[in-house]
Amino acid sequence: MAIVSDVPLGGGLSSSASLEIAVSVLLEQLLKVEMTPEDRALLCQAAEHNFAHMPCGIMDQFISSCGQKGSLLLIDCRSNKGELVSMNDPSVSIIVCNSNNKHQLTGSEYPDRVKQCKDAVTILQAKYPEVKALRDATIEQVESMKEEMGDVVYRRALHVVSECQRCLDCKEALVAKDYKRAGQLLYQSHESLKNNFEVSTPEIDTLVEIASHQDGVYGARITGGGFGGCIVCLVDSVKADEVIKALEKQYKEKTGIECTCFVTSPSQGARVLKAYEVDEVVKAAPTCECKCPMKKLVKSVPFWVGLATTAAAVSYFVMRRKN
């Protein structure tokens, strides 16, 4: 099996979930196993929990498996159901900007935050037994238990509870095409991720700060697991090229690091590629690090599974079947 990918590793663009989901689709085809996109996402999440020992949520696997072209996905992590939210207005674009400061989730930072959120629920339940998860709590309830939680657990809970509401508010703003409001929510989200959940970095904060001063930018925030990686910007399509130039220039001046930016749009999740799609895959296939012509490899194999992530980075998983 040859794996060809241009999803940046450690960029917060679901590189691990992309691999998990696409390999699952490949195995389903080989073994003739029928699986719903939702079940596939849950299976791959379990693989990351049990074999990579990373207590990740379901978001990355869910969008990689269930994503639809032209739509965002509002995920209910209790019912494991998704609601499509149209995002195909040509007047707005999404820019992904990679800080090229790779995030690291192999330490205790992520598991620590999972535990802190669980601790917050336990503390809340002493007074509010109806709270089964932080999504059930209100800001007022969290504030009332601030002393019992302590500063760190309080701020973690405050972020999660407020972020749940921001997700719902952002959905309404996007449906109404109120991009100014959606952008404000992105900025608020980033501030909370920075100050309350503490998963941002100086480089990421620099990118968001630069973006916030550019004409045509509605909003920006860190994306992915945090501790490095990428930001996403919601921008006026007419201004997209100018915004990218400003980000690249000013980020290099401020940090000495070159960032990588591209315009993207929501795309379909993992699927088996049809014969007529092969030419598109060949055109998009990158050259691997050893400089060998991967496009020749892609042309030579008869079995295809492709995955397009929400960041519009595309992974191609190809397998040469022996006769």
Regions found by a protein language model. Give the residues of each.
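C-terminal nucleotide
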Residues: 71-219, 234-306, 316-317
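Short alpha-helical patches at coil-to-helix transitions and adjacent helical residues
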Residues: 17-24, 56, 114, 163-167, ...
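Residues at beta-strand starts and edge strands
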Residues: 1, 91-93, 229
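Hydrophobic single-pass membrane-insertion segments
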Residues: 317-323
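Glycine/serine-rich anion-binding loops at beta->alpha junctions
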Residues: 6-23, 216-234
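Gly/Ser-rich oxyanion-binding loop with an adjacent helix/lid
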Residues: 1-88, 240, 262, 268
